[in-house]
Amino acid sequence: MIGRARPLMFLGTGSDVGKSVLAAAFCRILKQDGYSVAPFKAQNMALNSYITPEGGEMGRAQVVQAEAAGIEPHVDMNPVLLKPTSQMGSQVIVRGRAIGNYSAQEYYEYKKNLVEVVRESYERLAARYDVVVLEGAGSAVELNLKEHDLVNLAMAKMADAPCILVGDIDRGGIFAALLGSTMLMTPDERDRTIGFIVNKLRGDPRLFASGVDILESRSGLPVFGVVPHFDHIALPEEDSVALGRRARRVETRGSEDALMVGVVRLPYVSNYTDFDCLEHEPDVELLYFDRPEQVFGFDAVILPGSKNTIEDLAFLRKNGMAEAVVAFYKSGGTVVGLCGGYQMMGLRVSDPHGVESSIREIAGLGLLDMETEMFQDKVTSQVTALNIGGSGLEVSEDDALRGYEIHMGRSASMGGARPLFRIVSRDGLPVQVEDGLIQPGGRAWGTYIHGIFDNDGLRKAFLAGLKSRSGKTRVALSAGFSYQDWKNEQYDRLADHIRQHVDVKRIRRIIGLW
């Protein structure tokens, strides 16, 4: 074993089976039991990312797990992050810093250079914590990818980690998935696998008792638990599968008792975790949509972050969404842009160096009087900012707003709209930098700061403005909702749910935690 930590790894029979959630649950459970715990995923591919206090970029799943463990996120918890920029390529981020855009073939050729990077990151965590909870990616036994494996059984061997194989019974084929996965393992890999968790059962777990017997008798491995599907716990999700689920909810809109907020679903959307806090506000219905005719009827439309602003803007123009959003604003609606969405709201976006696209220049929506140019260097910083924009977002100028920047472009105001925020610190260092723009009246504004809605005061001010403009007198805006308190409640609920349905004590004994 590397370092002093006891490792425990969750492997999956496929994507979206619940590895990330179970890893977060065990981070919380072991924290509650008095252990210092850190999450770890060697390589993550994600639409959403986060900036650490040191200015490093990492995947949001490990941020959630770190929060559940009660510790500050660090890039060692996710040393390699892949952010898709096209159908065939990704931006590769190593130890929190972007090293370039790679095609799949180029990345496979480069991957061997990352083994020691991953090992060193894991060793640092293992030396600092009692337990490291590791997470694999996708299926643990993709045989055609095994030669280049960095995140699944190769990582388990590197960390000498006992592994729990997780299967999703809701999608069907649980026996083939779990038993078939173990059959494809080498003898050493099977020896490292300590048991199964059957996840996402709809109904009474007791009705699967015969299934547990079949799995245990055919594999010789224990089933540590059968976890029911839950709806009473809400956790941030980071992959495109989750976004698809959210987009299908658009047909539920129409309530006069809630503020209706629509997020445009972009082909290269990123950091849609920016809207989790709004999604769980008691008086808000937040929905994702991608058809122009859906825009009217919302109280506000948000253009989210993008991994390819120019291509996404071209998409909006092609399918008519750009015209619809402008018409929505002209009819009295509120439009907000975050990061790439903020860039789209300007007069034009140019990319003379081909950073994102072969398109060198494209017209923006013209809702904010600014222009954006893409540059090779990437801004990644945690920031503290003050509101200076006034009208429409009445937050005290003394209220410190916290968030983070992740962007390749630089935007310059052409006059007209007012600066929205003044950034007063980046990665803990004092600065004086204006950010964002807001039109008089507050119906059009944008910012580069991700996580801006996580600030309770600003979010409440934004919603109060929407209520006033919408005339929805029945909306009662809950004053007591704290997003941070709400998240901690979800982590505790998750821990309770897993303790109820998984033999946590048995797992603890196996990994040496008595």
Curated annotation (Swiss-Prot):
Swiss-Prot/TrEMBL GO biological process terms: cobalamin biosynthetic process
Top-level taxon of the source organism: Bacteria
Signal peptide start and end residues: none
Active-site annotation: C339, H450
Residue intervals of the GATase cobBQ-type domain: 258-458
Pathway entry: Cofactor biosynthesis; adenosylcobalamin biosynthesis
Keywords: Cobalamin biosynthesis, Glutamine amidotransferase
Gene Ontology molecular functions: ABC-type vitamin B12 transporter activity; catalytic activity
Alphabetized PANTHER family for the sequence: COBYRIC ACID SYNTHASE, DETHIOBIOTIN SYNTHETASE
NCBIfam families listed in its UniProt record: cobQ, PRK00784.1
The protein's role, per its UniProt record: Catalyzes amidations at positions B, D, E, and G on adenosylcobyrinic A,C-diamide. NH(2) groups are provided by glutamine, and one molecule of ATP is hydrogenolyzed for each amidation.
Family listed: Belongs to the CobB/CobQ family. CobQ subfamily.
Name of this protein: Cobyric acid synthase
